[in-house]
């Protein structure tokens, strides 16, 4: 006998498949069995049809194709006997889905079986319909399902309700047919029918507002009574789960009450008492009770306001936070985050418990609790919360320190009551987790320090102390050497001592030692060492007695394999040795940096193709030169190399001061002496400028430390090129006249318009540079509200360069307007049009508003 004939039993086939030792053997067994089944199908063997289909279902579950057996399902369904129909419907649900065209052929059989006199066959048809019903089948069979909702047998009514749910999901328009039958099911005593009826009514309410109003008026009181009866019912072994009567029905009723009470005060008042009873009397020592309590809390927080109930609900969530089950604590944290918008004061009372969750061993709970704490922080509690988080930072796991550090820095920066507290907390974070502090954070710290002149001495002394215990934190080292370079005299002289400070004695040599250690430390990278060299140059001016030692330390890097450090060492040594008359001017103390400008730039997160600069476009980090010495002879470097033009740099200090080192293009020509000198001085003091073209000279710009991989192209000289450098040097040297020849031949456009804001663009062209377009953006407020913290951001494709000037104001008056100028250079003029993505952010009455759009309607020819 063929072991794989149609007469083979299902168990024998399963045994043969499981006996296969390799995948190839299994495929061979399945292939032979499928061949035998195909032969049986072709012979129309009715005796073994049900057995063949059972085998196909098992083969299908193993992942092998069984499409050739789909018609066998229909043949078995059409059979008169119950056993054949059972296998047929089971195969239909398993081998087919609602997307199969074969389903069109089974609709008539389903309709006949739904009207069958045998209730078990009716049940089979309902099961199949509930699993694979398509939209077409739903429209054809909805009347039969509606009729069966009133069938005498509760099992049929239950299955019909589940089918009705599927029908409503597929064809929402049919929901009105089930409103009255669904309402009738809510009065059922049989729990199985009742739970499906509640589920059906919930689905109807979600898709039909008319049905929602109907159930609110007709069924709310009945549902409340049903829930009260179940909550107060005595022990029933049939429905009891962990001492609670039918928790599944509890949860379904609470979900429906939540839908009915949301947005309706009368319905909410009707259910307040029962919700309070469920919330206060349900035991929380078992999982079933916790599930009911969680659903009850969700319902309380969703219905119309009742202060006492909400406090009760949030207290339940607070108890959840003390539960040993991580899942319960996690869902409690999630729910508390959603509750913040409803009753933040009640959530604040559980702050200590939430803070303990931050210290939990479970990573998911840690992160969720940290997010919740971050939302709870305000001006009143920032000090104790920041203190707790910073203390935990010392002992937290390495994997969690990054997120924790970022949140602490954001909290401290956002809610700091005073600058000295902000500086103290940031120094603690830098000391404990400096390696996790992002660049924009410590850049912002430097901006705050420059804006607190009365704290300069205190800050530099605090940093000096911190370095002795946390020298491995590179970010701390960078901030410290920057401050020592700027305020070394205050460190040594103990200037600006505060009452809370302990006296400290620091000599000039001690200050030099700290910076020298930063250069020689094995963890210091190129950026840190470059900053340390600049700090040493400044110290040599602050402390003339240490000049020789500083010169010696700087000279040790003349042979560095890092060209960046090598050239800085050579040039700084030359400044100390040959140009003492201008050294003090070169290394003057940094001017106060504009906090508002930096915050706006930082919030914008503009892409690299966008440059935003101030009205005075050039500022040099770590000192502004003001001397009138001959620039060509400054360092005896007469190189002809010029820096490559750049549209923007991500370097902080260049970005912060709005440095715009781009050169206007012009016809090639000989470099003027003032231009060469300007480039040298620019190269000397810059930190983030791009590397220049090397034309055989070793004296090019080797001072760039962040953009050395930028594309390099020769810069062309222009009569207007030195203008920004002349601004830097207070106007020394000739100031070439600026061309005013601009044409306004392009029409204005409405770049963006919403119900609250309108943006107009006006265009002018520079006749000497047709690729460049000057745009004046006019922002018009269409509302009677004042827009504060107004910020316009834009991004363009790579073939465009965009330069943004600051807006005329960061506040847009009611029904008023402000202007902002920008310059767009199209390197593909004539080939590609200008396009731009824009984003506008502002606040209305303290609420953040963000509008975005794409501008494609620029005039042709730009």
From Swiss-Prot:
The record, for SUPFAM superfamilies, names: ARM repeat, Clathrin adaptor appendage domain
Extract one GO BP annotation from the record. Answer: vesicle-mediated transport
Pfam families the record matches? Adaptin_N, Alpha_adaptinC2
* Keywords, alphabetical: Cytoplasmic vesicle, Golgi apparatus, Membrane, Protein transport, Repeat, Transport
Q: How does it assemble?
A: Adaptor protein complex 1 (AP-1) is a heterotetramer composed of two large adaptins (gamma-type subunit and beta-type subunit), a medium adaptin (mu-type subunit) and a small adaptin (sigma-type subunit).
The role this protein plays is:
Subunit of clathrin-associated adaptor protein complex 1 that plays a role in protein sorting at the trans-Golgi network and early endosomes (TGN/EE). The AP complexes mediate both the recruitment of clathrin to membranes and the recognition of sorting signals within the cytosolic tails of transmembrane cargo molecules.
Kindly provide the name given to this protein in its UniProt entry. AP-1 complex subunit gamma-2
Species of origin: Arabidopsis thaliana (Mouse-ear cress)
Q: What lineage is this protein's organism placed in?
A: Eukaryota, Viridiplantae, Streptophyta, Embryophyta, Tracheophyta
């Amino acid at each position: 006998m063929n072991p794989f004939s149609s007469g083979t039993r299902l168990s024998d086939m399963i045994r043969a498949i499981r006996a296969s030792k390799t995948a190839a053997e299994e495929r061979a067994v399945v292939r032979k069995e499928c061949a035998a089944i195909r032969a049986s199908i072709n012979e129309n063997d009715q005796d073994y049809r049900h057995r063949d289909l059972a085998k196909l279902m098992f083969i299908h579950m193993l992942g092998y194709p069984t499409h050739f057996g789909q018609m066998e399902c229909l043949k078995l369904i059409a059979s008169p006997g119950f056993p054949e129909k059972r296998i047929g419907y089971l195969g239909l649900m398993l081998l087919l889905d609602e997307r199969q065209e074969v389903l069109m052929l089974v609709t008539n059989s389903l309709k006949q079986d739904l009207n069958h006199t045998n209730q078990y066959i009716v049940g089979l048809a309902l099961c199949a319909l509930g699993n694979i019903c398509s939209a077409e089948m739903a429209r054809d069979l909805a009347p039969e399902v509606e009729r069966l909702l009133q069938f005498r047998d509760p099992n049929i009514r239950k299955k019909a309700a589940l089918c009705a749910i599927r029908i409503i999901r597929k064809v929402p328009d049919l929901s009105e047919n089930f409103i009255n039958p669904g309402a009738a099911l809510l009065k059922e005593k049989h729990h199985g029918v009742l739970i499906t009826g509640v589920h059906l009514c919930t689905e109807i309410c979600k898709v039909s507002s008319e049905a929602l109003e109907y159930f609110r008026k007709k069924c709310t009181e009945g549902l409340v009574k049903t829930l009260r009866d179940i909550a107060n019912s005595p022990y029933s072994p049939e429905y009891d789960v962990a001492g609670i009567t039918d928790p599944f029905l509890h949860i379904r009723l609470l979900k429906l009450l939540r839908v009915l009470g949301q947005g309706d005060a009368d319905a909410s008042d009707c259910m307040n008492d029962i919700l309070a009873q469920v919330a206060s009397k349900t035991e929380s020592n078992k999982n079933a009770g916790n599930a009911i309590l969680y659903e009850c809390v969700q319902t309380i927080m969703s219905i119309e306001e009742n202060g006492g109930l909400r406090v009760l609900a949030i207290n339940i969530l607070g108890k959840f936070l003390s539960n040993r089950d991580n899942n319960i604590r996690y869902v409690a944290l999630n729910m508390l985050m959603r509750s913040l918008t409803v009753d933040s004061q009640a959530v604040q009372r559980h702050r200590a418990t939430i803070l303990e969750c931050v210290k939990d061993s479970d990573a998911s709970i840690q992160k969720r609790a940290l997010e919740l704490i971050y939302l709870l922080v305000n001006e009143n509690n920032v000090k104790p919360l920041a203190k707790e988080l910073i203390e935990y930072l010392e002992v937290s796991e390495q994997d969690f320190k990054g997120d924790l550090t970022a949140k602490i820095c954001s909290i401290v920066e956002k809610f700091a009551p005073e600058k000295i507290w902000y500086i103290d907390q940031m120094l603690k974070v830098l000391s404990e987790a400096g390696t996790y502090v992002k660049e924009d954070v410590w850049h912002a710290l430097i901006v705050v320090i420059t804006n607190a002149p009365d704290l300069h001495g205190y800050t530099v002394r605090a940093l000096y102390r911190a370095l002795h215990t946390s020298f491995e934190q590179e970010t701390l080292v960078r901030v410290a050497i920057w401050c020592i370079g700027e305020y070394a005299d205050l460190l040594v002289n103990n200037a600006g001592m505060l009452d809370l400070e302990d006296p400290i004695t620091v000599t000039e040599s001690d200050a030099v030692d700290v910076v020298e250690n930063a250069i020689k430390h094995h963890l210091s990278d190129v950026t840190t060492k470059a900053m340390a060299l600049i700090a040493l140059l400044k110290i040599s001016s602050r402390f003339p007695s240490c000049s020789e030692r500083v010169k010696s330390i700087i000279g040790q890097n003349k042979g560095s394999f890092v060209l960046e450090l090598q050239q800085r060492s050579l040039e700084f040594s030359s400044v100390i040795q040959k140009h003492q008359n201008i050294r003090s001017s070169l290394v003057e103390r940094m001017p106060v940096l504009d906090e508002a400008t930096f915050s706006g730039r930082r919030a914008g997160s503009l892409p690299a193709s966008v440059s935003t600069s101030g009205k005075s476009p050039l500022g040099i980090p770590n000192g502004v030169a003001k001397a009138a010495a001959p620039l060509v002879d400054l360092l005896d470097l007469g190189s002809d190399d010029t820096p490559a033009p750049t549209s923007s740099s991500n370097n902080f200090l260049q970005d912060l001061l709005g440095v715009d080192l781009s050169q206007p293009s012009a016809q090639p020509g000989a470099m003027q002496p003032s231009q060469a000198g300007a480039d040298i001085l620019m190269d000397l003091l810059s930190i983030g400028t791009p590397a220049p073209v090397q034309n055989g000279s070793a004296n090019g710009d080797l001072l760039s430390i962040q953009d050395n991989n930028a594309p390099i192209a020769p810069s062309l000289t222009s009569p207007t090129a030195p203008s920004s450098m002349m601004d830097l040097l207070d106007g020394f040297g000739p100031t070439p006249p600026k061309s005013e020849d601009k044409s306004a031949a392009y029409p204005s456009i409405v770049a963006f318009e919403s119900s609250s804001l309108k943006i107009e663009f006006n265009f002018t062209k520079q006749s000497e540079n047709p690729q460049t377009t000057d745009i004046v953006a006019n922002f018009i407020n269409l509302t009677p509200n004042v827009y504060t913290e107004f910020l316009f951001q834009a991004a363009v494709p790579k073939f465009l360069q965009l330069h943004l000037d600051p807006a005329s104001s960061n506040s847009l008056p009611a029904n008023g307007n402000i202007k902002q100028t920008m310059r767009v250079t199209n390197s593909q003029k004539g080939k590609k049009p200008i396009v731009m993505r824009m984003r506008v952010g502002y606040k209305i009455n303290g609420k953040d508003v963000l509008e975005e759009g794409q501008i494609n309607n620029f005039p042709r020819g730009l």
